[in-house]
Amino acid sequence: MGELPGSEGMWENCPLGWVKKKASGTLAPLDFLLQRKRLWLWASEPVRPQPQGIHRFREARRQFCRMRGSRLTGGRKGFGSSGLRFGRGGFSEEVMPQPVLKAMRCAEGAWWFSPDGPAGSAASIWPAEGAEGLPGQLGRDRLEVVYSVPDNVPGQNGSRRPLVCKITGKCLSVCSEENAKAGGCSAFPLLLSQLGARMTGREHAHKGPELTTPDSGLPRPPNPALAGFRALAQHSPPLGTSTPSAVLLSAAT
């Protein structure tokens, strides 16, 4: 996986683009991979009397973001994302304490998404495209939800590992990351990849180049409206370039 070329305009030639922000408060650094075309979201609702943090997932029927192809100066564009509030002063880095996964309206008719789950939990949103073993009908416009579950969930062997759920809300697979590759579990192809390791905070497993660094020498957008927005989007590879299918949005507490 090579460096992202700086000569290509973001969003124009490829549906994938990189953004990164560092969250404040108790959240670990968040990495975002945003897609230009419209995506459907999942929402979560508590399932009782399941252990704390277990959620069932339903389709939210709301679009994540209608990301336009227009560019700001320098070919980069900022978007409202998790942990960011949009106001007259631009974007701030305030993390929104949401009790459940929730889609919200943001500027310019787009949607933004808060991954802040219940205390002690974590949630990640994954695109289904390129995820081996996931239902083929999901396609690019559907997302899979990967949710960290408590230690006492059956089948987790005492470890905090993700659940992967599909449209019906039923669990597609429950297996630990450690035994996924050895046992042939196909629910974690991205978690086991180098990029998945980066996006889930397992940076020690990442051997490739630094893909998203907000202070990598790239000029910040000169637009005053984005003065408080520190998540800079890097350029996307041109058409025909092998682009990873990876985390759309990941959060870790």
Curated annotation (Swiss-Prot):
It comes from the Eukaryota. Residues 200-225, 234-253 are annotated as: Disordered. Most abundantly expressed in gastrointestinal tissues. Expressed at lower levels in kidney and placenta. Expressed in fetal brain, liver, placenta, kidney and lung. Residues 200-209 have a biased composition (Basic and acidic residues). This is Uncharacterized protein SLC67A1-AS. It comes from Homo sapiens (Human).
